[in-house]
């Protein structure tokens, strides 16, 4: 999957560890949660 920035990763994507996985459709898989809040973002940033 493609890494994405969770809210807990920090304010920018430069120099931070991206701990989320990008899911484009259907929300996060079972057992995962959306770790990204509101904002201009396509899909869901999911984390185990």
From Swiss-Prot:
GO BP annotation list: regulation of signal transduction
Keyword hit for ATP-binding: no
GO cellular component, one term: extracellular region
UniProt entry keywords in alphabetical sequence: Disulfide bond, Ion channel impairing toxin, Nematocyst, Neurotoxin, Secreted, Toxin, Voltage-gated sodium channel impairing toxin
Record localization: Secreted; Nematocyst
One Pfam family, short name: Toxin_4
Predominant subcellular localization, coarse grouping: secreted
Gene Ontology MF term list: sodium channel regulator activity; toxin activity
Disulfide bond annotation, renumbered to this chain: 4-45, 6-35, 28-46
Source organism superkingdom: Eukaryota
Family membership: Belongs to the sea anemone sodium channel inhibitory toxin family. Type I subfamily.
Cited function: Binds specifically to voltage-gated sodium channels (Nav) (site 3), thereby delaying their inactivation. This toxin has moderate activity on Nav1.1/SCN1A (EC(50)=about 300 nM) and Nav1.5/SCN5A (EC(50)=307.00 nM). It less potent on Nav1.4/SCN4A (EC(50)=820.84 nM), Nav1.6/SCN8A (EC(50)=about 900 nM), Nav1.2/SCN2A (EC(50)=1449.17 nM) and Nav1.3/SCN3A (EC(50)=1458.42 nM) (when measured as the increase in the slow component).
Protein name: Delta-actitoxin-Bcs1a
